[in-house]
Amino acid sequence: MVKIYTMISTNFLSNKSKFFQPQKNRGSVTWRCSSNIELIKYWGKYEELLPFNPSLSLTLTNAYTETKIDYTISDKSSVEYFIDGIYNTEMTQLITEFIKKLNSNFSFLSVLKLVIHSQNSFPQFPGTIISSSEVGSLALCLCSIEEELTGQKAESEFFFRKASFIARLGSGCAARSIYGGSVLWGTLPKINKSSELYGIQLGPLPFLEDLNVATMIVSSSTKPDPPLIRYIKLQLYNVASCRYEHATMHILRLLDIIKRKDYFAFCGLVESEALLLHRMVLSSSVYGVFFHPETLNIISKVRSFRKKSGIPCCFTIDAAPNIHILYPNQFREIVINFIRDTLLPNCESQQWLDDKVGIGPVIIDKNFNYCDDQIILQDNF
């Protein structure tokens, strides 16, 4: 039987009395957390990174961040951030500001010296300050430090709920990287545990968990013009209520498609959802597009390949020229050959990332049972 919890933000406040008798003065924790790709897109926020609409994503396997935090109780708090072993001033400032916002959630932060080492398994493109996997791994480390200092081990469900809540405060999409498989963030009818405060894992959903994901790197350097970004943010705010209804409808349709195991309906819905934002941009009076000519070439070739081969291979795309190709694992060899022979000439230096849907974050060098709190989809979907 699935337990039902109603959680509000005060559930994640720190119990200060526990920390004043710390169980240790120093320690180290390491988490590996993967990035996610959206099938139903997150279109904006209100208040403290609460989403205008529910979104649904797939957590990857090979595109991950591994973060280690060495912590020491000190008279004065401080943060040092290293990426690939190199001290990073910009990230140190960014994470220091983020940490300051979390004092009500982790009372111990005001007396800790934190040395953070982060390493990405995937390229960090210009224009991306911090990835969802970086924020997710950082949030998981902080929750583990809380357990070590208080000597109180939280129930698995609460631990990951809080980690997702904390990750959301750093980057909205990071709330979904705390779980594996398919993840929902935002309130959705018929899903009692769904929340704007954190993500929840949906499953088991073999239909989605079997998918391979290939990311075609069309450009590693393009950053949208500020006027275009300002226009998009304004438009997203203006259509927020409409977008909530539309995204909700798309997620419910997607869940029905999964139940029916209709791969081609899945392709149609995912591609339609992916292009909604770009249609709005193309119809705007502000000059600018996210697409490159190579982006359109890949879209055309994927659709042509699907039609000719009968293989349910589709794409999704974010606010960037790069494209994610999704396909069932049983067609892996055929699709990989198609990518190498047909799509790679459209990629920058023929770069692409080969990935698949993953199990979610793991703690490194410690015995830890990953969260098995899955939301079981009922027959009424």
Regions found by a protein language model. Give the residues of each.
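C-terminal nucleotide
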Residues: 2-48, 58, 62, 72, ...
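Glycine-rich, flexible beta-strand/loop modules in the N-terminal catalytic cores of phosphate-handling
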Residues: 56-110
